[in-house]
Amino acid sequence: MTDIGESESDISTDVSALPMLSHSVSYTSIQKPPFVVSVIGSGNWGTTVAKIIAENTRENPLLFEQKVRMWVYEEEFEGSNLSDIINTEHVNKKYLPGIKLPDNLVAVPDLLEAVQYSNILIFNIPHQHLEKILSQLRGNIDPRARAISCLKGLRVNLDGVELLPDIIQDALGIHCGVLAGANLAQEVAEQRFSETTVGYPLPADYKPGDVDHTVLYTLFHRPYFHVHVIEDIAGISCAGALKNIIAISVGFVEGLEWGDNAKAAMLRRGLLEMIKFGRKFFPGCLVSSFTEESAGVADLFTTCTGGRNFKLAKIMAQTGKSAHEVEKEILNGQSAQGLITAKEIHELIKNKGCEEEFPLFETTYQILFHGVRIGILPYMLENKWSISKPNYSS
């Protein structure tokens, strides 16, 4: 039996069977292969995805330019610039230590240099920095480029919900898809088997030879990292954001030692509310994206068995401390994304007058921010909770 980390020449894509792909390598009308790929972001997950891409571009030279540029936010580590360490030692010692990177992966500290001539842009940065990055890129990339967002989350305000790929698309005028799944970066970097989902509907201006599902499959698929390409960006994006609220509810149950049956109840109810939310605010999203894809139920399961949101809620239940207190103690100044998402979702559904349609989301918010007892969760599962009920915090 072949180890999944060893040679995969027997299963790599046969590029000779693919159409010759022409594309833009400058801002002129000249079209010629292969695709040039740049990764924007070099953190734990960003470096892992860049490693995968560099492995695949090296094996598919007719389809991709072999050199992959990865934008690195320059910082000093152990007396040297991080980009220099990556380029000389082929290891990201700060964010992905111990993992050897392909020598065709090049760290570039200048953002515009990193994306110059690129046809495929991979966004993999903390979403709070997205606007700043987009403002620097605007007007400086090929307008015919395509993009994939590896960011998980939504932009929520009182009026509605925006998908992060749509924000990228609107800012840069380029078509953007999404990649998400049950993908713990360290496990993927160590070449342990996992799956992921790519959401990418073909753009309205698609022509033969453009980036399509085959190209994206070839770019991301590895023997240890299996890829399924679908068209539902909204379903993948909703699942990636809402899972963190559900992980908090499961963490509450774990902290109170209610057992596996109770955790299963939270997962079941959370999955249903996740689907309902997606269908309500993005009617075109597919139920199958939540129930069949790695970006849906698989990522939900992984998030609800560990991670910072689960751990925060577990400690809250065990100690009686507030979310703010626990966050300060265990996250070293960082934020648990589930807290932010829970508040944003509450404000949205309250503004839309549909709190009672999402009792798990609403109750989790009330526990986090208004001192409601965690013990109300079983009552919530009977769908009797609403903000007009008596005060359950005493």
From Swiss-Prot:
Pfam short name (any one): NAD_Gly3P_dh_C
One GO cellular component, as annotated: nucleus
Cross-referenced InterPro entries: 6-PGluconate_DH-like_C_sf, 6PGD_dom2, G3P_DH_NAD-dep, G3P_DH_NAD-dep_C, G3P_DH_NAD-dep_euk, G3P_DH_NAD-dep_N, NAD(P)-bd_dom_sf
Binding site for substrate: K152, R308, N309
Top-tier EC class: oxidoreductase
Active site: K243
Catalytic activity: sn-glycerol 3-phosphate + NAD(+) = dihydroxyacetone phosphate + NADH + H(+)
UniProt key word ATP-binding: no
Keywords in alphabetical order: NAD, Oxidoreductase
BP terms from Gene Ontology: carbohydrate metabolic process; glycerol-3-phosphate catabolic process
Cystine crosslinks: none
Positions bound to NAD(+): G41, S42, G43, N44, W45, G46, K152, A185, R308, Q337
EC number: 1.1.1.8
GO molecular function: glycerol-3-phosphate dehydrogenase (NAD+) activity; NAD binding; protein homodimerization activity
Keyword Cell cycle: no
Gene3D superfamilies, sorted: N-(1-d-carboxylethyl)-l-norvaline Dehydrogenase, domain 2, NAD(P)-binding Rossmann-like Domain
PANTHER family hit by this protein: GLYCEROL-3-PHOSPHATE DEHYDROGENASE, GLYCEROL-3-PHOSPHATE DEHYDROGENASE [NAD(+)]-RELATED
Similarity comment text for this entry: Belongs to the NAD-dependent glycerol-3-phosphate dehydrogenase family.
Protein name: Glycerol-3-phosphate dehydrogenase [NAD(+)] 2
